Amino acid sequence: MKRILSALIVLASIGAQAQVLYVNNSDNTFEAVNTTNVKQITFDSAQQLVAVQGTDGTTSQYATAKVDSISPCNNGGAALTYSNDRTVVFDAADATNFPEIVETIETDTLIDESGDFVENYRTTKIITINFSETGVTCNSNVSDVTYTVTNNSHIVINSTRSKVGYIVRGTCSNGSLKIYSTKKFQIMVNNLSLTNPTGPAINIQSGKTVYFTLGTNTTNTLCDGETYAAPTIAANGSEEDQKGTLFSEGQLIFNGTGSLNVTSLGGHGICSDDYIRIRSGSITITSLKDGFNTNDKFQMGRTANASPIVKIKADGNGVDCGKGNIIIEAGKLGINAGGEALKAEYDGTDTNITANTIISGGYITARTNDEKSSIFKTSGDFTLNGGNIHGDVKGNGSKIINSNGNITIRGGKITGIVDGSLSSDTTTAGGFKCDGDLLIDNGTVALNCKGEGSKGFNCNGTMTINGGDITILATANNFVAAEYDRKTRAITGNNITINGGSVFAKSHDHAINGTGITVNNGAVHAISTNATAVNTATTQTGGWLLTQDAQ
């Protein structure tokens, strides 16, 4: 009774000069509501919830156990703590202000990762390969590193020697380098410009690690041809791979501070049948197929002295990992892809293989153009620990994140703009799509899904928000056709639990649609322009639930 009388007295005392109504919480926080819109203050039958109802259709609901008092302010001393309108834009500052993880060089040779660091590799033999328009020369004079040259400028190296390094330089518009090696080795490109009109510019037929060093203050260019010649037949009778402009059977580890420009007219840009790791350097790829294509993982980090800058324009996927993880910890990565921007997808039957995506630092800006493409496509889990991401998808049925597993946001910032509507097979466009659970502990998520029938969050598992700042806009009309009807919603899923943070969801249809929503803490603002804002059973033990139904 005391709470009811207090609410009535407060409502009656709001005069013409009062501008802000404060709801003061027991944890010393408050919400400020515009009094000019206050219609009434009510309690539920059990007096567990108090609701401030506005003439504009808004309802601000609180758990009475967490509210100390409700009081008006006549001097307009504080701004309102909510707005019914938000925008989603790409912040230019994200490109310069982002966290990075500086790698630790592993020196323990018993740990596999130690093999990724050229700092642990000491060359004992340096061989120089010079290309020119009239031919290629090689200064190898040892029996365990032999070479042959065909058509003046196509050189093949055969090596059984360990701790060898190749300095490759010069300019040639019709040449190539192929290396067979039983040991790991280092390639140091030094102002190399090499084009092979009939295949890869560099083809490494070795399953061993290759340290690919971009010489300081050097600019290097590789290009293949539109049509590849018939592949070489290996000793076992199989055809040798020649999948792109720069191809390796083994691991490719990039380091150095120079630049590498790769153009692929007939295959992938840079390809490994193992994994690719970029530690530093500037790499630009223009590719007919994928930018980077790996059979295993793709990893970007940074050394203590430099971080990588990678730019990809690909008609296929920007980065494609067949059965490995995508790991990005530092650097700048820009992608304009016809297909998926970053794809870690394993479609085999080995249950021990998972393809996850883990972003812990750096700045990623990516755009996709094809139908049903995504910025991140992963058959495993997607995790954002840190870093800034800008995603712009244009195709119908496309997503910012499309995960067959779980999506976890622990920090960082992701901004996504989705322009597409339904695809030809009625797949909806949207922000986050996960077949598993969605967990947000911290960070910033801002999504604007502009197409008809779009979904902001679409989660088949449970959805838990413990913190962070989340904005989801999905305000286009529903997609209505003779045979189906796809609703435009900000959040749709099963059980949704809000334990903290700020959630702003605005949509044409229900802003929140699910099996049930529980608000224990935090602020949830749900607005619908054409339906009820929340279409699910609601339990509230704390926090602030502001809803605005269509008028």
Language model region names:
Residues 4-13:
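Sec-dependent N-terminal signal peptides
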Residues 14-18:
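Sec/Tat signal peptide C-region and signal peptidase I cleavage site
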Residues 19, 33-34, 48-50, 60-67:
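Extracytoplasmic low-complexity repetitive segments enriched in small/polar residues
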Residues 19-23, 48-52, 77-81:
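Short polybasic amphipathic segments
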Residues 20-38, 54:
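Short N-terminal segments immediately surrounding and downstream of signal-peptide cleavage
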Residues 35-43, 63-72, 91-98:
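Structured surface patches comprising rigid loops and adjacent beta-strands/short helices at the edges
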Residues 55-79:
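Mid-chain, structured segments of secreted extracytoplasmic proteins
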Residues 82-83, 96-551:
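A composition-driven surface/loop motif
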